[in-house]
Amino acid sequence: IEDAEALRRVPHVEHVDPSAQGNADVEAEGKSRRVTVYGVGHEMAQTFRMKVQLGKFLPPDDPSAARAFVVLGSKVKQELFGTVNPLGSRIRIGSERYRVIGVMESKGQVLGFDLDDTVYIPVSRALELFNRAGLMEVHVTYHSNAPLDRVVKGIKTVLLARHGREDFTITPQQQMLEVMGSVLDVLTFAVGALGGISLL
C-alpha cells in the first residue's frame, strides 16, 4: 500500500488504485452468497471509468485505518436486497460487518469477470480478510498527453528506490484496453511474488 501511495508523486500519474482480490461469503437480510471481493483504493471508479448508481464510492480514508464500508455490484445488490434500498444496511463479509454506502452501475462481463457479481471494500481490509502481506497489483492511469516511456521510467525509479531491486513487473495494458474499450491510458504493475503493477 505504501508503494501505491508513493506512486502518486510520479509525474504525469493521474489515478492510483492498489488492488487485492479473493472470494468470500457475503451475508445480509438472512441471505448468503459467495462473491468476488475486490480490495481497492478510493480512485478505482475513476481509474476504470466505472459509475456509482446509488450512494457513493469508497472515501479517501487513511489506507492504514480505512473504515468498514462496502460498495455492492448491481447483481449482489439485487440478490441480497431485491428492490429495497441497501444504503446504510450492514452486511457481513467473512467475519466482519460492513456498512453499505454505494451500488455500482451494471457493467456486465469484462475479460471473463462478472463485475456486477462483486463487492468493493478498502484494500487494507481485503489484505486482512485474505491474510495477505502485500498487494496483487496496482493500477495507474496517466495523463493522455504524457509519453508512456517517461511514466514507466518514473514508476520504475520510485519502486527501485523503495525495494532496492527490480522485484516487480510493469505492464502497459494495451491489449486489455483494446478489449475493454472504455478504459484509456491505464498502466498496471505487479510487485514481486506478492503482487504486480499495471499501467492503464
Where are these regions (language model features)?
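Short amphipathic beta-strand/extended segments in non-transmembrane regions
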Residues: 2-57, 170-171
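Solvent-exposed polar/charged
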Residues: 8-9, 46, 128, 161, ...
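Short linear capping/connector segments at secondary-structure termini
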Residues: 21-23, 61-63, 138-139, 173-176
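A short acidic, helix-capping loop that chelates divalent metal ions and anchors anionic groups
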Residues: 25-28, 108-112, 177-180
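Mid-to-C-terminal secondary-structure elements
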Residues: 38, 42-62, 66-165
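Peri-transmembrane interface segments
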Residues: 154-155, 164-197
